[in-house]
Amino acid sequence: RRWTAPPRSGLFFSVLLRPGDVPVARWGWLPLLTGVAVATGLARSAGVDTALKWPNDLLVTVGGEERKAGGILAERAGNDGVVIGVGVNVTLRADELPVPQAGSLALANAVSTDRDTLLRAVLRALEDWYGRWRT
């Protein structure tokens, strides 16, 4: 599926993780723990209720119903890494949504839509969850 959004309306980034000595059989958990980290970071920094829909959708509540506001993808990078891609609709208005079941942090009444603040919170949460997973 395609993900489209107007310029500067979302938070879109990739992170290269190198799990090192963690057995490859456990790497399948990386997109899931990233989802938890993204949901945690956004809940803290944007002040919105978040939920995860298996296996990689980030949901927010808009008008009393859950809507997809983001997603997580993972792809193996060589023999020793995994690239995690994250996309979150931050400031999209209702008329900018690609499909009716989509949402954004702004439509979920986020207390902050500053992308720098949101990114820092998500990366801090990812660092925490990734560290726990590695041990």
Task: Give the predicted meaning of each segment.
Residues T4-G10, S14-T135:
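Catalytic beta-strand/loop module used to bind and position nucleotide/cofactor moieties
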